[in-house]
Design a protein with these regions (language model features):
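Dynamic "connector" segments at or just before major functional cores
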Residues: 1-70, 81-161, 528, 546
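Short amphipathic alpha-helical "interface-anchor" segments enriched in bulky aromatics
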Residues: 331-384, 390-393, 445-455, 459-491
């Protein structure tokens, strides 16, 4: 279905066209009526400013590459908008011509913004003051875990509806080009707050954050010698799902942020990632290859890997040094770096990656050993079925056995160049006795992947997915545009406000990407950007007219 929305002109002021576009995006989220219903009270004075107007103003600021300050939103609603746009957004009264009128308008906008955040704030902690631990506990609102989870679900539904509204701008052809390839990554979103002080015992003015550490799963902790790891910033961690393209395929759609959730650094990265993927899938985006870094490889399988597979994603992952080699076994089959192999897989092939990282072998030998693993890999017979169970058979069975094995007489002829099992197991396991074995979904769930690790296909897929994800992170953090890494541009504290601002900035980044994509592909031109010309003369100058 066509989007029905026309992108406004590049930022250069809030025109009626941009205001209408921002209002249409908010309408497409379907969240403004939900917020109004949650804020409705049977008694008391009616709130004069609708939530839709404040949200549309923040969208306009994000599209303009301006900081989403409450003061800027007030100036836009009560000064920069035309009368027609104010009527469209339901802004009462006229422009705020005096300072007194502006302050009154500012109070209305600020009240409305905080009311919006209160509907979906999962944090009971007080903000904007550096408190002692005793005062922090005394001022913490009572909130049960069920209430916090419900508020978190409302918050994540809201911010993902903002991203979906920006994706809905794509036309039918652009949406159909997405084949399900997805990158998942967590990136720090620094907060406008200093961290807690170990010397004074005072809390952070935004206690919803945590120290972001570059290593591991980004939690604050000590290294193996008991020395605290270097803290990068006081931040929240944004888990972002990004649409991607197959490796080597010509660009057919822009790569956009499709899912988002924020949490403290290192706080249940697997569960947060699974919620993001579930949101993407629930909105109708097809699942496909899923690339992520080692922080997710180490997650609890029941929190991340199994939910991701249940949603239909096929993981493409890397491993830490302590995760290499044999990772699991089932029915005698060995799970070696993500794939199931014959139990007679030679030790040099099992230890190939560990030896490469230990500089015991070179890349040429390593590539040959990775290629040699293919003969020992179990053959897919059928599945996985709807329950996740898969039937795999011995590589020395079938009409075209890849191995010569004395336990499989049919594989002994012809005597060609196929690898030969020289030392079969003394007590053959089920994989050596049966035609096939059934692998349950939980066997080696943390490490299993469908592409042989370090194979050319794995390298191409993993590099493409990871580069796409890191590219989107850098794109959204560009100081000239969304500046996601600049906390001074996001001064309202709390996880609810930070999540809303992050979603608005990613929404604006998506719109900027769509606009750039269409500019590159307009008129049937190749969707490959050329570097700006620096030479004074070019052979292209002599092309004939027409």
């Amino acid at each position: 279905m066509s989007s029905g929305l026309v992108l406004p002109a590049a930022p250069g002021g809030v025109s009626d066209e941009m205001a209408a576009f921002a209002a249409a995006l908010i309408d497409r989220t379907g969240q403004a009526p939900v917020i109004e219903a949650a804020l409705a009270r049977p008694t008391g004075r009616r709130r004069p400013l609708p939530a839709r107007a404040v949200l549309a103003a923040l969208v306009c600021l994000a599209l303009e590459d301006r900081p989403p300050f409450i003061t800027e939103a007030t100036r836009l609603l009560f000064g920069r908008l035309s009368p027609a746009s104010r009527v469209l957004l339901g802004v009462p009264g006229g422009p705020a011509a005096t300072r007194r009128a502006f302050l009154a308008a500012y109070r209305r906008v600020r009240y409305c913004f905080h009311a919006i955040c209160s509907v979906m704030d999962p944090s009971p902690l007080p903000k904007n003051r550096r408190l002692s631990q005793q005062d922090l506990r005394a001022r913490t609102r009572p909130m049960t875990s069920a209430q916090a989870k419900a508020a978190r679900d409302r918050l994540e539904a809201f911010i993902n509806s903002l991203l979906e509204a920006s994706i809905s701008v794509l036309d039918e052809e652009e949406r159909a080009a997405f084949d399900g390839c997805t990158g998942l990554d967590a990136t720090p979103v620094p907060l406008f707050s200093r961290g807690p002080s170990a010397r004074t015992g005072l809390s952070a003015s935004d206690p919803d954050g945590g120290w972001y550490i570059r290593e591991g799963d980004h939690r604050e902790r000590q290294d193996d010698k008991g020395k605290p790891l270097r803290k990068i910033c006081w931040a929240l961690e944004a888990t972002i799902a990004v649409t991607a393209r197959p490796p080597g395929a010509p660009p057919a759609h822009p790569n956009l942020a499709a899912g988002l959730a924020l949490a403290r650094p290192g706080e249940d990265p697997g569960g947060t990632g699974a919620r993001v993927l579930a949101s993407v899938a629930a909105r109708g985006h097809k699942p496909g290859w899923l690339g992520y870094d080692r922080a997710y490889t180490a997650a609890v399988p029941a929190r991340f890997h199994l939910p991701a597979r249940a949603l239909g994603y096929s993981p493409v992952m890397d491993y830490r040094a302590d995760q290499l080699g044999i990772q699991a076994s089932s029915g005698g089959a060995l799970l070696v770096e993500g794939s199931w192999y014959c139990p007679a897989l030679p030790e040099p092939l099992i230890a190939a990656t560990a030896r490469l990282r230990g500089h015991s072998i070179g890349h040429d030998l390593y590539d040959r050993q990775i290629a040699a693993r293919a003969a020992y890999q179990l053959k897919r017979k059928d599945g996985p079925d709807t329950d996740g169970y898969q039937r795999l058979s011995c590589p020395a069975t079938g009409g075209h056995p890849r191995l010569i094995c004395p336990l499989r007489p049919a594989s002994l002829s012809p005597r060609d160049g196929r690898p030969k099992v020289l030392q079969p197991p003394d007590e053959p396991p089920r994989i050596c006795q049966q035609t096939a074995i059934t692998i349950p979904p939980g066997a080696g769930a943390r490490y299993r992947q469908d592409l042989p690790y370090a194979s050319p296909a794995w390298h191409a897929r993993y590099a493409t997915l990871r580069n796409t994800t890191e590219g989107l992170n850098g794109y959204a953090k560009d100081p000239a545009h969304q500046a996601l890494a600049q906390p001074a541009r996001r001064r309202v504290r709390g996880i609810a406000a930070c999540s809303l601002f992050t979603a608005l900035l990613l929404m604006a980044a998506n719109i900027r990407k769509i606009r750039a994509w269409r500019a590159l592909t307009a008129g049937g031109k190749a969707a490959t950007a050329q570097r700006a010309r620096r030479r004074r003369a070019s052979l292209r100058d002599y092309l004939p007219d027409g």
